[in-house]
Amino acid sequence: MTPSISWGLLLLAGLCCLVPSFLAEDVQETDTSQKDQSPASHEIATNLGDFAISLYRELVHQSNTSNIFFSPVSIATAFAMLSLGSKGDTHTQILEGLQFNLTQTSEADIHKSFQHLLQTLNRPDSELQLSTGNGLFVNNDLKLVEKFLEEAKNHYQAEVFSVNFAESEEAKKVINDFVEKGTQGKIAEAVKKLDQDTVFALANYILFKGKWKKPFDPENTEEAEFHVDESTTVKVPMMTLSGMLHVHHCSTLSSWVLLMDYAGNATAVFLLPDDGKMQHLEQTLSKELISKFLLNRRRRLAQIHFPRLSISGEYNLKTLMSPLGITRIFNNGADLSGITEENAPLKLSQAVHKAVLTIDETGTEAAAVTVLQMVPMSMPPILRFDHPFLFIIFEEHTQSPIFLGKVVDPTHK
């Protein structure tokens, strides 16, 4: 029987605690000179922005009535690492599917960009708890190509484990233990079933624990209605916050835009469409517009009502990536001969992406710097996130989209 690669791509964003900071704003937060402007960062951010939106639109095409949550960074990292061992059309499809222009960007620069991104995300000195991990699980009688192994370790910080896939329960435990440890127990059963021909598995995770500089006050949280659609309403715990916030209305998107900063180097962008404008928002949203929001912040007195929620996403990447042009790797025409020294052809038989996000009131106070700002004497806007909305969480040094999601029903986990 022809061996095949079974690849489980696994992601976690665990205990994502949104803590708004309207009293602890630092002038440097709007100073773009503080951002990492290296070519590697710029390159990866540009491509990941395009990739994230393309992937999101494909998910909407598959189902526009459910919550969406995924990590463009996690998915792109795993496929980019796999490209190290691919050749021919398989290789080209992967990198072009990740939105890289191979006539303008060398393969070496692509992998250096990912290396720089992972080093930035895994900085131990950051206030933001953000870590990633890549695990290569190799059948004990399979020998990997040394060049692939060295580059996977060097560029993608990959850990290598020798396992016996003939003992599927034992192999699952090794993979699941790796992910469970890396995600601090948030994903305990990442792999439920392995294909019988599996000889190689790749697991990627990302753990994100974000706290706002100033938390919501739980005493202000009250039960309120959330309108899933025109005929469906659910009850949710609705958090409330008032103060000087980065909020404005974007006529291009027909949506309200809210930016909220984490302690550390991450920002969440929330997009609340006007009535009946969700489809317009999804069709019009672009990485250029998001970049403008991040660079040109507008603070004003405002009040927001935001649902406490916990959502997750689990996706079959074969059906998700194929419309983006990544098809060869999943069929018998795949060329992954740069991974193993064996002559038997390999293909990607399984590709799974999992993500979890929690938003609640908890968080930590930052050293407060009181900022007084004159504002026009007009009625402050009241934003009620009581109908479906989008959000994107960015790492600020690289301007890379870590997570992208859509909340349709905050009660559906």
Swiss-Prot record:
Subcellular location: Secreted
GO biological process: acute-phase response; protein N-linked glycosylation; response to cytokine; response to peptide hormone
Main location: secreted
Keywords carried by this UniProt record: Acute phase, Glycoprotein, Protease inhibitor, Secreted, Serine protease inhibitor, Signal
GO cellular component, one term: collagen-containing extracellular matrix
SMART domains registered for this protein in UniProt: SERPIN
Domain of life, source organism: Eukaryota
Residues bearing carbohydrate: N64, N101, N265
Signal peptide: 1-24
Molecular function terms from GO: serine-type endopeptidase inhibitor activity
Region RCL, annotated ranges: 368-387
Matches recorded under InterPro entries: Serpin_CS, Serpin_dom, Serpin_fam, Serpin_sf, Serpin_sf_1, Serpin_sf_2
Site positions (Reactive bond): M377, S378
Note: Murine alpha-1-antitrypsin is represented by a cluster of up to 6 individual Serpina1-related genes. The precise complement of Serpina1-related genes present varies according to the strain of the animal.
Function: Inhibitor of serine proteases. Its primary target is elastase, but it also has a moderate affinity for plasmin and thrombin.
Entry note about domains: The reactive center loop (RCL) extends out from the body of the protein and directs binding to the target protease. The protease cleaves the serpin at the reactive site within the RCL, establishing a covalent linkage between the carboxyl group of the serpin reactive site and the serine hydroxyl of the protease. The resulting inactive serpin-protease complex is highly stable. Variability within the reactive center loop (RCL) sequences of Serpina1-related genes may determine target protease specificity.
Family: Belongs to the serpin family.
Protein name in the entry: Alpha-1-antitrypsin 1-1
